[in-house]
Amino acid sequence: MTANNANKKHLLVLGTASHVGKSAIVTALCRIFSADHKVAPFKAQNMSLNSWITVDGKEIGIAQAIQAKAAGVEPTADMNPVLLKPKGDRVSQVILLGEPYADKSAGAYYDSIEETHDVLKGALKRLEAEYDLIVMEGAGGAAEINLYDRDIVNIGTARITDAPIILVGDIERGGVFASLYGTIQLLPEDVRKNVRGLIINKFRGDPAILESGLTELEELTGIPVLGVMPYFKLRIPSEDSVSIGDKSADDGEHYDVDIAVIRLTRISNFTDFEPLEHMAKVRYVDLSDDLGNPDAIIIPGTKNTTSDLNDLVESGMADKIKSFYGMVPILGICGGYQMLGKSIVDSGIEGGESARLDGLGLLDIETVFDAYEKRTVQVTKTVKESGPIFDSIKGEDVKGYEIHMGISSSKRPVFGDDGCADDSGLVIGTYLHGLFDNVNIRRALISYLLEKKGLEFKEEEIPDKDPYDELADVARENLDMNKIYGMIGLEPEKV
């Protein structure tokens, strides 16, 4: 346990594998505990291309930003001290305490793991000084026995804090009893002794059918099952691109507007487009697929603009996109904005080797990568006159955040000094992530697309209930919260 944290409370949520629902469970617990306590989320190391920028310009995984929001506190870099952003070719950009540190292979990263260990200890200590409860999340499967000697996010966090542990398994994948039991058996003894409860997640159907299995699992492990969480559609931003596969092909079929988002190989921050799912059918189109007949096309952000531009061209998707030029809006966000330009000049910062690439040529910009520097900032911009799509909201403010390397020149900005539009105003690029979180932007885009089809705009379908309260209520209904409070040493929630 870290120094001077004897009076601080910790809870660690581990999983049997990736995508079992650890982040959602932590989010629910953060909202529940925040009713009576000052709570902070923590994940020592996150690997994700969906990230968030804090108010002081630090980059963290979006899951920890979501969890902080659920807890009612401001996200900070200490909540996710290490963020790994895969770039391809077994190399990731390492973000330490919200700042770009270096591009490293897995081997090089683990060679310096002791230094990283010190970073997370410092982050935890600072959180302990400010919060009275820290709800921590592991990564992937907890029982990665080949990594025990250098793991910082599961075994490392467990040993540093000596926290009570909840282990989560995903029944939707099948084999949940074996995965829970096997994970427990493979954990080191000093960690295994702190596993105080089990959760089965994403169950469809009547949980009564599981009762005999739950009883036997408890007898085999000596660990209580805290509950069975039902499968339901979360209304909080997704953590990583694995979640794209959860989006049904039938989602949004009842909407009149069809938006095609290009699923780049290294797609990042696709959460940008989830707000549009309340107003349109949003499809993620693989590079090898046909675009169909979209009302708008969006090229999203990417962790590696040059590599994904090459993939876009070689797959033929670039030509497919250009075939819609002048017919439907074509929007580019961050790396997608860079690809829409005339050219990209890379000194080796982005792609590893110096190169000059032709872009799609739909915007009059050139992007230059000449320094290992990243712009990370929250911004407020004013909508400028840029064409028919956003003409109805000219002069209004929009908020967003920037996460990018490279500098783009533009003679016709769209949002303050940001972005670029072509002469028709139908091709627009911007560095603003979170653009469609702005109600005025969503309404302007969807209204324009509906008007083109001779249809009337309808207000978006958003349930009245706060999505974090909704998730917390599902947890309260299906988990033994008294046991969870008890394992931490806290009084149950005051109702």
Curated annotation (Swiss-Prot):
<dbReference type="InterPro" id="IPR011698">
    <property type="entry name" value="GATase_3"/>
</dbReference>
<keyword id="KW-0315">Glutamine amidotransferase</keyword>
<protein>
    <recommendedName>
        <fullName>Probable cobyric acid synthase</fullName>
    </recommendedName>
</protein>
<dbReference type="InterPro" id="IPR033949">
    <property type="entry name" value="CobQ_GATase1"/>
</dbReference>
<comment type="similarity">
    <text>Belongs to the CobB/CobQ family. CobQ subfamily.</text>
</comment>
<feature type="active site" description="Nucleophile">
    <location>
        <position position="334"/>
    </location>
</feature>
<keyword id="KW-0169">Cobalamin biosynthesis</keyword>
<feature type="active site">
    <location>
        <position position="433"/>
    </location>
</feature>
<dbReference type="GO" id="GO:0015420">
    <property type="term" value="F:ABC-type vitamin B12 transporter activity"/>
</dbReference>
<feature type="domain" description="GATase cobBQ-type">
    <location>
        <begin position="256"/>
        <end position="441"/>
    </location>
</feature>
<dbReference type="Pfam" id="PF07685">
    <property type="entry name" value="GATase_3"/>
</dbReference>
<dbReference type="GO" id="GO:0009236">
    <property type="term" value="P:cobalamin biosynthetic process"/>
</dbReference>
<dbReference type="InterPro" id="IPR047045">
    <property type="entry name" value="CobQ_N"/>
</dbReference>
<dbReference type="InterPro" id="IPR029062">
    <property type="entry name" value="Class_I_gatase-like"/>
</dbReference>
<dbReference type="InterPro" id="IPR002586">
    <property type="entry name" value="CobQ/CobB/MinD/ParA_Nub-bd_dom"/>
</dbReference>
<comment type="pathway">
    <text>Cofactor biosynthesis; adenosylcobalamin biosynthesis.</text>
</comment>
<dbReference type="Pfam" id="PF01656">
    <property type="entry name" value="CbiA"/>
</dbReference>
<dbReference type="GO" id="GO:0003824">
    <property type="term" value="F:catalytic activity"/>
</dbReference>
<dbReference type="InterPro" id="IPR027417">
    <property type="entry name" value="P-loop_NTPase"/>
</dbReference>
<comment type="function">
    <text>Catalyzes amidations at positions B, D, E, and G on adenosylcobyrinic A,C-diamide. NH(2) groups are provided by glutamine, and one molecule of ATP is hydrogenolyzed for each amidation.</text>
</comment>
<dbReference type="InterPro" id="IPR004459">
    <property type="entry name" value="CobQ_synth"/>
</dbReference>
